[in-house]
Amino acid sequence: MIRKLTNADFQSILNVVNNVAIAYKGKIPSDMWKEPYMPAQELKEEIQSGVQFYGWKENNVFIAVMGIQTVNDVTLIRHAYVLTSHQRKGFGEKLLKHLLRLAKTSKVYAGTWEAAPWAIKFYQKHGFKLVSTQEKNNLLKKYWNIPERQVETSVVLELKRQPK
């Protein structure tokens, strides 16, 4: 079931993210790939910046994690990962819907690699729309703390909805 993750789940978050992120290897620009994909210090910084993780646990193992972050007047969906063995079984959808229920803003954004069509399609399936390149650049620089090279090679999707 879905639950809010705590410091006790830190290693589990890292395990899911780094296990699933292997799919990016050879697809995202090689200068952006690193192993582990998300080092522990980077995850600490994400949590300190306000990303709250939620996870799905089955048989005492986390199979999916996803983060949510409110920044000023928008909500960001961050670090959405489902173990490969559990993909296309509704876990990502259920986590996303749970986070959208928590979001209190009228605009929700998700960023991902341009070279990850599976991730783009996932968000589009749930009503998100790709923003223009100019808007993407502005949004990534305003709401995310990522290198310029990642800005160049990413996309942003937006979900407009009624504020809570």
PLM feature segments, named:
Residues 1-15:
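A short beta-loop-alpha structural element at the N-terminal edge
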Residues 18-43:
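Conserved GNAT-fold acetyl-CoA-binding loop/helix
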Residues 41-54, 150-153:
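A short helix-loop-beta-strand connector motif used in the catalytic cores of GNAT acetyltransferases and
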Residues 55, 61-69, 76-81:
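Conserved beta-strand in the GNAT
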Residues 70, 83-85, 89, 115:
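Active-site acidic-Proline motif in GNAT/NAT acetyltransferases
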Residues 82, 88-101, 125:
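Conserved acetyl-CoA-binding loop-helix of GNAT-fold acetyltransferases
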Residues 110-120, 136-141:
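Conserved beta-strand-loop-alpha-helix junction that forms the acyl-donor binding cleft
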Residues 124-133:
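Conserved acetyl-CoA-binding loop of GNAT-fold acetyltransferases
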